[in-house]
């Protein structure tokens, strides 16, 4: 359910990138059409670090506009530090290990269904030994529960 707002924000940002003048007009900006910018010429001697800091993307402007409409006191704006330093609880921390918000399974090895069946079968064989099926009933080929 949390992916729907993320997908909606992504669609809106793509739409704003396709229509560069629509965001400034909707926010009360200049009604003139915006000229598309030309990419800067690259030379082999230019360094990897940009000379000027990169401008904030259109998504940032959209986010700021939406935050202003909702009310500035309701949620912190992206990129600004939290007022309380990011701590939610003032008491001591009981567990010193890394905190996980949800229970996470540690994936080791192959995650294909056939590999999992193979691993479970091998573990059963290890637990029961090679004489594992001697105590069970023989397979009846005419039974609907058998594979025969």
Swiss-Prot record:
One GO molecular-function annotation for this sequence? Answer: protein-containing complex binding
Site positions for Required for CALCRL receptor interaction, renumbered to this chain? 107, 114, 119
**Superkingdom classification of source:** Eukaryota
Q: In which tissues is it expressed?
A: Expressed in the esophagus, stomach, jejunum, ileum, ileocecum, ascending colon, transverse colon, descending colon and rectum. Expressed in myocardial cells of the heart, renal tubular cells, hypothalamus, and pituitary.
Which key words are in the record? Amidation, Cleavage on pair of basic residues, Disulfide bond, Hormone, Secreted, Signal
Q: Which family does it belong to?
A: Belongs to the adrenomedullin family.
* Name of this chain's protein: Protein ADM2
């Amino acid at each position: 359910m949390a992916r729907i707002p993320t997908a909606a924000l992504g669609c809106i940002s793509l739409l704003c990138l396709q229509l560069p003048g629509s965001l400034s007009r909707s926010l009360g900006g200049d009604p003139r059409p915006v000229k598309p910018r030309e990419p800067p010429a690259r030379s082999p001697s230019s360094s990897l670090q940009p000379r000027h800091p990169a401008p904030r993307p259109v998504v940032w402007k959209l986010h700021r506009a939406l935050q202003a409409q909702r009310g500035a006191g309701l949620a912190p704006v992206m990129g600004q530090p939290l007022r309380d330093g990011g701590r939610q609880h003032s008491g001591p921390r009981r567990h010193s290990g890394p905190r996980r918000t949800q229970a996470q399974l540690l994936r080791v090895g192959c995650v294909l269904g056939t590999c999992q069946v193979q691993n479970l079968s091998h573990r059963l064989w290890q637990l029961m030994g090679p004489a594992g099926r001697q105590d069970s009933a023989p397979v009846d080929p005419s039974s609907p529960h058998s594979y025969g």
